[in-house]
């Protein structure tokens, strides 16, 4: 029987290993995602973000880093989390079903050249999948943060989209990597805007 201290230590060790494994495959696609976002934002586009549960919190976290700041002062950047308007979410969910709570907002707010960030640890969240389909209808780019094998989301992405798939089976480790990816993207964007990298 393990002690609570051993369990906590095991979480740290597994989290470190998961990040190291993800880092082996996700550095280049993360840079691609940041460059795609920069291109969108510099052309007066916007970024929409969505997810469920912890992924909804990540979508909101990302939007806050864009509209406010990450670590350094810079201009405000156009990003909206589609997870925050309870009136829209409940009205759409009630009238059209939960699978459409994000896609209806994407169709209302998204324009060609904008970006949808879809976050799903399983890669199989039906409402995120519908949002991606809606984004493609609007000629938007998609940046998908997924886990495990990428799920159904990986299969519907276009060549012009970016897949950031964390190859780990545990939801907690995937979520920890997703927030790391979000922070890395924010840092890349700030580095280009503030330092001309």
From Swiss-Prot:
Q: What class of enzyme is it?
A: isomerase
Extract the GO molecular function terms from the UniProt entry: carbohydrate derivative binding; D-sedoheptulose 7-phosphate isomerase activity; zinc ion binding
| Cofactor(s) needed for function | Zn(2+)
Q: Where in the cell is it found?
A: Cytoplasm
Q: Which PROSITE patterns match?
A: SIS
Q: Name one GO cellular component term.
A: cytoplasm
- From which residue to which does any coiled coil extend? none
**How is the cofactor bound, as the UniProt entry phrases it?**
Binds 1 zinc ion per subunit.
Instruction: Give me the reactions it catalyses.
Output: 2 D-sedoheptulose 7-phosphate = D-glycero-alpha-D-manno-heptose 7-phosphate + D-glycero-beta-D-manno-heptose 7-phosphate
On subunit structure and binding partners, the annotation says: Homotetramer.
Indicate the family of this protein: Belongs to the SIS family. GmhA subfamily.
The name of this protein is: Phosphoheptose isomerase
- Taxonomic placement: Bacteria, Pseudomonadati, Pseudomonadota, Betaproteobacteria, Neisseriales
Q: State the gene name recorded for this protein.
A: gmhA
């Amino acid at each position: 029987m393990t002690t609570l201290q051993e369990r906590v230590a095991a979480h740290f060790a597994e989290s470190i290993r998961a990040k190291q494994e993800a880092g082996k495959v996700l550095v280049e696609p993360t840079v691609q995602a940041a460059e795609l976002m920069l291109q969108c934002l510099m052309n007066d586009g916007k970024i929409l973000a969505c997810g469920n549960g912890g992924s909804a919190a990540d979508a909101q976290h990302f939007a806050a880093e864009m509209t406010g700041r990450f670590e350094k002062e810079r201009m405000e950047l156009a990003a909206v989390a589609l997870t925050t308007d309870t009136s829209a979410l409940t009205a759409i969910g009630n009238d059209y079903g939960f699978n459409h709570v994000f896609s209806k907002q994407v169709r209302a707010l998204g324009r060609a050249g904008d970006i949808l960030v879809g976050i799903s640890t399983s890669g199989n969240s039906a409402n995120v999948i519908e949002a991606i389909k809606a984004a493609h209808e609007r000629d938007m780019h998609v940046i998908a943060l997924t886990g495990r094998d990428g799920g159904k989301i990986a299969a519907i992405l276009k060549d012009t989209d970016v897949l950031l798939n964390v190859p780990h089976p545990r939801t907690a480790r995937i979520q920890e990597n997703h927030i790391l990816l979000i922070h890395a993207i924010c840092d890349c964007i700030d580095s280009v805007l503030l330092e001309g990298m």
